[in-house]
Design a protein with these regions (language model features):
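A late-sequence structural motif
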Residues: 141-185
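Flexible hinge/capping segments at coil-to-helix
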Residues: 45-55, 59-81, 166
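Secondary-structure junction motif
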Residues: 79-100, 165-167, 179-185
Length: 188
């Protein structure tokens, strides 16, 4: 979609920034970003819901929990847990708080790819948004959580946006009915 937009508007420059939903929302509130593709956060911005995304358990191949149809949330209290973005307001932390779960954290990292590598190596289990998991689907087992946990994923943007941002917003909203379910790679 970015290349299609720039074909129509070659004079508009774009900068793509990666970060957690909370980091990107903070950039939006500080006017350091015009748009954020994030899980839902409160704040002084507009919001367009794109999808309700399931959270999934990440398991190493051959792990006993891979025999189940879903991973019970309380399994994270006893299994070796790999925490991504420790101490930050991320979806995993929100899910554990919502479920009153204290995970058995044995490893932590500030890099989601390191989380997947550690899971693949059998060091523990983790959770992530399903939309982020497609790049690893052949190397890590993804199972639903029990009870089911989801996060709203959408486009956040400022209340007062520039004409260039307005053009991008119209372009995106015109495309929304045609957006495939797996389009975005969201860190969180």
């Amino acid at each position: 979609m970015t290349s299609d937009f720039h074909s129509l508007h070659p004079g508009i420059q774009s900068r793509i920034v990666n970060g957690t939903s909370s980091e990107l929302q903070q950039m939006l509130s500080l006017h350091q970003a015009d748009f954020c593709l994030i899980s839902e956060r409160s704040g002084d911005h507009n919001w367009i819901l794109l999808r309700n995304d399931p959270m999934v358990a990440l398991l190493p191949p051959g792990h006993p929990l891979t025999q189940k149809s879903a991973v019970p949330m309380n399994a994270f209290e006893t299994e070796s847990y790999i925490q991504t973005y420790p101490g930050q307001d991320v979806d995993n932390a929100r899910i554990f708080s919502r479920c009153h779960i204290t995970p058995n954290t044995q490893f932590s990292t500030m890099d989601i790819n390191a989380t997947y590598s550690m899971v693949e190596a059998g060091l523990g289990i983790s959770i992530n948004n399903l939309v982020n998991s497609y790049l690893w689907q052949d190397r890590v087992v993804h199972l639903p959580l029990e009870p089911n946990q989801t996060m709203n994923i959408g486009l956040a943007y400022g209340k007062n946006i520039s004409p260039a941002s307005e053009a991008f917003l119209h372009f995106i909203t015109d495309k929304l009915p045609k957006v495939p379910k797996v389009l975005f790679y969201i860190h969180d």
